[in-house]
Amino acid sequence: MNQRLQRLGDQIQRELAVLIRDDVNDPRLTGFVTISSVKVSSDLGYADVYVTIMEPELNDAMSKHSHEESLKVLNKAAGFLRTELSHSLKTRTTPRLRFHYDEVTARGNYMMDLINKAVTKTEQTSADDDADRLDSEDRS
């Protein structure tokens, strides 16, 4: 991706974050939407917007199916968002927006949770071993 497309993608990412937060008032959009990245096609026809959605009532961050409703809302609002985006972009055409669930970020969060659990378990095991060693030294 050349530098111009990268800059345009970054600008779209910033603008969309504000637009989604302030102007999309659909009650079906229950989670906190974060835009991970935007990839603009070389002909400026499309912009693939990768999002993660943190649902407050869901514990499973890896559940892609739980976010399908929010993605439907975003894809339905894509025309409105494109129109609003056209007011701030300095391009002749505004790319069509396609929203996708960013599985890379979700998988990374899931892996961090697993690592944190393993570290906590290791620390507990180490503390238990130290307590057992001190207890056996006291008996001697």
Curated annotation (Swiss-Prot):
Function: One of several proteins that assist in the late maturation steps of the functional core of the 30S ribosomal subunit. Associates with free 30S ribosomal subunits (but not with 30S subunits that are part of 70S ribosomes or polysomes). Required for efficient processing of 16S rRNA. May interact with the 5'-terminal helix region of 16S rRNA.
UniProt record, GO biological process: maturation of SSU-rRNA
Localization of this protein: Cytoplasm
InterPro entries: KH_dom-like_a/b, RbfA, RbfA_dom_sf
Pfam families for this protein: RBFA
Record note on quaternary structure: Monomer. Binds 30S ribosomal subunits, but not 50S ribosomal subunits or 70S ribosomes.
Residue ranges, annotated region (Disordered): 121-140
Family: Belongs to the RbfA family.
Protein name as it appears in the record: Ribosome-binding factor A
Main localisation: cytoplasm
Gene Ontology terms: cellular component: cytosol
GO terms for MF: ribosomal small subunit binding
